[in-house]
């Protein structure tokens, strides 16, 4: 029954903005970074510096701190909006499938969309690096190793789970697109300020992903554990509340 509900939720994504944003959001970051790198290419060539490490670092930081929180907010709001717009909750919850399957299915889809966007970000950045090299053959990009990119993005993917789960709960708890978007934007702004503090940034859900990139190995491991455990607990509580709540 669960997999049937999950498949149904996946089919709802067909031709939706939520699906398109998986491509659009990371590509915006990649294009901006490509433009910045191209503008400074002549300086980098003269200095003989390998531009791949800073290119990867700024791409990850821009995505994690700015675009990813907006992406998560938009995706959760759009997925909840599939039911809110047409007031489909009553008919959806009248189906024989247990309520928890609906909550968990939408959460799994949200996480999958985020991780898919991360894959697009990695592939597109590699493509932009090769394009940059073809335009400026003298530009040093080294061997363009994947480990400095993939490993941090894996940490980001895991440490973002707590923020995703909270935003998912907010989007389903209040059937207002404005509430969900407003909450997400406020959380993003607070996260930008909180990340400056090693104490607050290591616990605030929207700061965890960027702290997982900036902190040392021991800090990264602790942040990942906090995010994953917190996500499991929050998802359990949110699902329990969703099952018990009267939704109209």
Q: Regions from the language model: what does each represent?
A:
Residues 27-74, 104-168, 172-174, 213-216, ...:
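Secretory targeting signals
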Residues 82, 95, 130, 134, ...:
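Transmembrane helix-loop junction
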